[in-house]
Design a protein with these regions (language model features):
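N-terminal leader/linker segments that initiate helical-solenoid repeat arrays
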Residues: 27-109, 292-295
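TPR repeat positional signature
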Residues: 69, 73-76, 110, 144-147, ...
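Short coil/turn linking the two alpha-helices of tandem helical-hairpin repeats
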Residues: 80-82, 117-121, 148, 152-160, ...
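Short solvent-exposed coil/turn linkers within tandem alpha-helical repeat scaffolds
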Residues: 99-106, 135-141, 160, 181-200, ...
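Residue-level recognition of tetratricopeptide repeat
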Residues: 115, 149, 153-156, 211, ...
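Terminal, low-structured helical/coil segments at or just beyond the last alpha-helical repeat
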Residues: 186-188, 199-215, 224, 250, ...
Length: 295
């Protein structure tokens, strides 16, 4: 079963990107603050009879210089945020990275490009941008969640290193949940906004884990993760309910499968008709076959 053409969760991903931008900035700042200071070389011993250089007055360290052109270029990129401007934004972002490879905004640019490449289904470019963002900040929640979610939805078991990539996606989602549990509230978000942004990210992480375990046919853990995600999801995901229905049906928990399919059928989209048909099948099985054991 392939979900390569099923992207009912992309709306949730887009919401996550918007809500999670402040989370991304927060984790970036937090990560930078946690980095150990670079070791300074030991002072050269002073010649005999002369004062040690370490005792001499030291000039204060200069603040990083701000390049007005760099700031302007980033603002132009940041403000080009309408969905129909994706091609322009990609061009601006790629130009920015070439011209300002050491900019303090590089991580945010890569994270935004990751989303744009995903929207265009240029997955190789998406993964490359994500890897570069995580190389700068391994705690970027948005990047961790999105890449961990996308891979199991586009999983190909015949791909080289398919299981390795599933394991990498699993590690990203688990790390994202760990970061979220410790994340301080950014100053520019209210308590309510922060809670919603965290729930959005956590819901997508649980959804990603659910699909990863589904690909491994670990249905019990998959169901647990998908249910955890749906409990806090602002927007229900038809794919998650469909997968739960498939798993519950395989476990002969037909009544629960019918309930999952029914929830899927109520969500407008490509899966609605299929889920309606599956609902009827599961209800029929529930009335004619013995139910499987519950966990």
């Amino acid at each position: 079963m392939s979900f390569r053409s099923l992207h009912s969760g992309l709306k949730s991903i887009a919401i996550l990107i918007v809500a999670g931008f402040a989370l991304s900035q927060s984790t970036s700042a937090q990560y930078q603050q946690q980095q150990p200071p670079q070791q300074q070389p030991a002072p050269t011993p002073a010649p005999a009879g002369k004062a040690s250089p370490s005792n001499a007055p030291q000039a204060p360290a200069e603040a990083p210089k701000i390049d007005p052109e760099e700031e302007k270029a980033y603002k132009t990129f940041y403000d080009t945020n309408a969905p129909q401007q994706a091609d322009i934004r990609i061009k601006l972002g790629e130009q920015f990275l070439v011209k300002y490879p050491q900019s303090r905004y590089v991580e945010q640019v890569y994270a935004r490009l990751m989303q744009d490449y995903l929207d265009k289904q240029e997955l190789d470019k998406m993964y490359d941008a994500a890897d570069k963002a995580l190389a700068i900040n391994p705690d970027d929640v948005t990047v961790l969640v999105v890449t961990g979610w996308v891979y199991p939805h586009n999983y190909n078991p015949d791909e080289p290193n398919a299981e390795k990539r599933l394991s990498e996606a699993e590690a990203k989602e688990k790390h994202a949940l760990d970061v979220l549990s410790k994340l301080p509230k950014p100053a520019n978000l209210t308590d309510e906004q922060f809670a919603k942004a965290k729930d959005s990210a956590a819901s997508q992480a649980h959804s990603g884990l659910g699909l990863i375990y589904f690909r491994r046919q670990d249905y019990a853990n998959s169901i647990t993760e998908l249910q955890a995600g749906e409990k806090i999801a602002a927007t229900p995901d038809a794919t998650d309910f469909y997968v739960m229905g498939v798993e519950l049906q395989s476990l002969k928990r037909f009544s629960e499968a019918a309930d999952a399919y029914q929830k899927c059928a109520q969500i407008p989209g490509a899966l609605a008709d299929r889920c309606k048909q599956r609902t009827d099948e599961a209800k029929k099985s529930a009335s004619t076959q013995p139910a499987g054991p519950k966990p």
